[in-house]
């Protein structure tokens, strides 16, 4: 699988994750203190990251700046997905900001799978695009 395919599929996984969080937020989660706003922020952040990963940033920005932008967006996607996975685990096994999940519904499994796919696919994209960021211009990338 090429990095370009990983980037696009990872972006779709982030979009699915955000859609699940938006659906939950628009349901009862918007009324849960702290957790509700975090679900809303996850949905917004996921949409921004997914859109950024789908855009031809390398074409719009100078080549290296585009690569760095893609790397940072991919890293952001990994961070949001890992944060959501860890938060769900904490809420399932204990409490998170006073909130605990009761059971793993189908929608939660959709979120878990999309978050895991996003991490697996976007981590290599982030690494590949951010390697040598501090190197001098024109220096060979390994």
Residue ranges of each PLM-predicted region?
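Membrane-interface extramembranous regions
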Residues: 1-142
């Amino acid at each position: 699988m090429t990095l370009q395919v990983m980037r696009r599929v990872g972006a779709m996984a982030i979009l699915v994750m955000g859609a699940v969080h938006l659906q939950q937020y628009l349901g009862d989660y918007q009324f849960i203190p702290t957790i509700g706003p975090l679900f809303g922020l996850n949905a917004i952040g996921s949409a921004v990251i997914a859109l950024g990963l789908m855009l031809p940033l390398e074409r719009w920005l100078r080549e290296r700046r585009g690569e760095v932008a893609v790397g940072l967006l991919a890293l952001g996607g990994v961070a949001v997905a890992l944060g959501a996975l860890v938060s769900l685990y904490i809420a399932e096994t204990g409490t998170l900001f006073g909130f605990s999940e009761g059971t793993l519904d189908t929608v939660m499994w959709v979120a878990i799978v999309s978050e895991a796919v996003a991490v697996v696919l976007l981590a290599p994209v982030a690494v590949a695009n951010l390697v040598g960021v501090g190197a001098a211009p024109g220096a060979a990338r390994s």
